[in-house]
């Protein structure tokens, strides 16, 4: 592990980073702050910073943030095995065991939120609370334009900020292309989660979506109804705008409000 310090708007926070051997993968992670562990799981084609760079330090004021980069993304090299949200969830569980963490909160965005749902389903004994942001658990829960975009997707359509962020960490264009192709293929073959599995989630949940997000508001509300111990936040804006994801308009007021909502959820003694 490597101990460093990082500055954010005149606030210096201690950062520990390293690689964990999990299920044949060398998973990169960064740790900020102290308190109850909160694992951050980025979206598809992304890195820690592109997804969470604008909220990470605000969240680390009240808990120990453990930000990860999943298989084939950022600092974490690809290996010869399929990409799946189930495998990603098992990798997070293995990381927590490696770090000797018995229970954690999990915050996933987009693809990372699909992993978060799988984590709560597959590893309930180490799940404290979950934050499920901008996702759906069945194909019909997403707007049809998403699937049209996925079926016609080409590398040239990948957002340039995500390309630049990947290459800054890993200059291999072959690795970048492979990551892109594997992420797209995973979405093109998206597997529904059964309603009964969603209903079986017992961990307190905060479900967040933009009002112009990839998931329909109706589906997001259905997920809220199915997870009995959940809260729902529909926030103005598109996919990831409320956390300042790198490809979205940067609205500092909206981002600060989202951090406040998340911290409030995590620090509330009981969710009903």
Where do the protein language model's features map onto the residues?
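Active-site nucleophile elbow and catalytic-triad environment of alpha/beta-hydrolase enzymes
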Residues: 181-197
């Amino acid at each position: 592990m490597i101990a460093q310090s990082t500055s954010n708007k005149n606030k210096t926070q201690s950062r520990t980073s390293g690689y964990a051997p999990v299920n044949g993968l060398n998973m990169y992670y960064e740790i900020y702050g102290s308190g109850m562990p909160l694992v951050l799981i980025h979206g598809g084609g992304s890195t820690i910073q592109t997804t969470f760079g604008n909220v990470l330090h605000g969240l680390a004021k009240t808990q120990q943030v453990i930000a990860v980069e999943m298989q084939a993304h950022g600092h974490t090299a690809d290996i010869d095995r399929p990409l799946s949200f189930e495998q990603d969830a098992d990798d997070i569980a293995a990381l927590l065991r490696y770090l000797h963490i018995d229970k954690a909160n999990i915050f996933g965005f987009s693809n990372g939120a699909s992993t978060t749902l799988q984590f709560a389903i597959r590893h309930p004994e180490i799940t404290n609370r979950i934050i499920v942001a901008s996702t759906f658990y069945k194909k019909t829960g997403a707007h049809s334009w998403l699937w049209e975009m996925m079926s016609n997707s080409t590398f040239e359509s990948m957002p340039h900020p995500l390309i630049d962020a990947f290459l800054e960490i890993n200059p291999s264009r072959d690795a970048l292309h492979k990551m892109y192709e594997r992420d797209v293929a995973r979405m093109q073959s998206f597997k529904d989660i059964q309603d009964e599995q969603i209903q079986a989630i017992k961990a307190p949940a905060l479900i967040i979506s933009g009002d112009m997000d990839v998931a329909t508001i109706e589906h997001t509300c259905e997920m809220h109804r199915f997870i009995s111990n959940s809260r729902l936040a529909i926030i103005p804006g598109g996919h990831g705008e409320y956390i300042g994801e790198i490809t979205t308009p940067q609205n500092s007021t909206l981002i600060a409000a989202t951090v406040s909502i998340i911290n409030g959820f995590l620090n509330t003694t009981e969710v009903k």
